[in-house]
UniProtKB/Swiss-Prot annotation:
UniProt GO BP: DNA damage response; SOS response
Name of the protein: DNA damage-inducible protein D
Consequence of gene disruption: A double yicC-dniD deletion in rich medium makes filamentous cells with little DNA in stationary phase, has no growth defect in minimal medium, does not grow at 45 degrees Celsius. A single dinD deletion has a similar but less extreme phenotype.
């Protein structure tokens, strides 16, 4: 567990069903909100995002009364909200981006939320590298569709517009390298796609870039392609900055797998036929 993520682990609770959950009051303090009332608007925006994504708010935000000590023997009932992992993911997306701990929270809950789509975290750890690549590439494929929709709503209208929009995201994440430069750096042939020649770590960084850009385009009500391009670049740069702060390898420095995603998919199909 990364040291920047450890505080989120330390306040994690496990309910009777074995599900992970967090106290809104504890999370608010960890995220740098000195008073709970300042954190409430963030929770409200997260609830709205939950509802807009088609989820039931009560499934992820459970309001409770928690008895806390206020003296030697006295206790007082305080309102709190029990947050699911997905709720925490939405909360950190709607928090104050100026707070350094928010960046750590965004990476922590984004990674944890993606892993939850598998049976459990242990299953993800036990996957081989090629299985992780297939899983993350499929995730990225689906989220890129949602990113296209969000970009279109923001004013990115044509195929050329979208290519420029995508390049801004890559340039932010890859320290100025656009799609063509990344393609050349990987030594790929003209018909080979860069996303099909990324390892799991690089795919995870790009998945994070895509999901965060989609969220920010919607949250900020972006309504011009110039603004959308800037947003994509800024998110990519922020992901790069977070990788750097956590001591990770820059995306352009990661090794390029010799076996492509297409080859892995074909191997799976052959195995399934046997």
């Amino acid at each position: 567990m990364n040291e920047h993520h450890q505080p989120f682990e330390e306040i994690k609770l496990i309910n009777a069903n074995g599900a992970e959950q967090w106290s809104a009051r504890q999370l608010g303090k960890l995220l740098g909100y000195s008073e709970y009332r300042h954190f409430i608007p963030v929770l409200t925006r997260a609830k709205e995002a939950c509802e807009n994504s088609g989820h039931t708010i009560d499934d992820h935000f459970e309001e409770i009364l928690d008895m806390v000590k206020i003296g030697s023997n006295a206790k007082r009932a305080l309102k709190d909200i029990v947050l699911s992992r997905y709720a925490c993911y939405l909360v950190v997306q709607n928090g104050d981006p100026a707070k350094p701990v928010i960046a750590a929270g965004q990476t922590y809950f984004a990674i944890q939320t993606r892993r939850q789509e598998l049976a459990d975290d242990e299953a993800f750890k036990q996957l081989r590298e090629d299985e992780k690549r297939l899983f993350l590439r499929n995730e990225l494929k689906e989220h890129n569709k949602q990113l296209v929709e969000a970009a279109q709503q923001a004013g990115v209208a044509t195929a050329t517009d979208f290519a420029i929009f995508q390049n801004h995201g890559y340039q932010g994440l890859y320290g100025g390298l656009d799609q063509k430069a990344i393609h050349q750096r990987k030594g790929l042939k003209k018909n080979q796609k860069i996303l099909d020649h990324m390892g799991s770590t690089e795919l995870a960084a790009n998945l994070f870039r895509a999901t965060q850009t989609e969220e920010k385009l919607k949250r900020d009500g972006v309504n011009s392609k110039q603004q959308a391009n800037t947003t994509h670049f800024d998110v990519g740069r922020k992901v790069r900055q977070t990788i750097q702060e956590l001591g990770g390898t820059m995306p352009e420095e990661l090794p390029t797998p010799q076996v492509s995603i297409k080859q892995l998919e074909n191997s799976v199909k052959i195995t399934e036929k046997k």
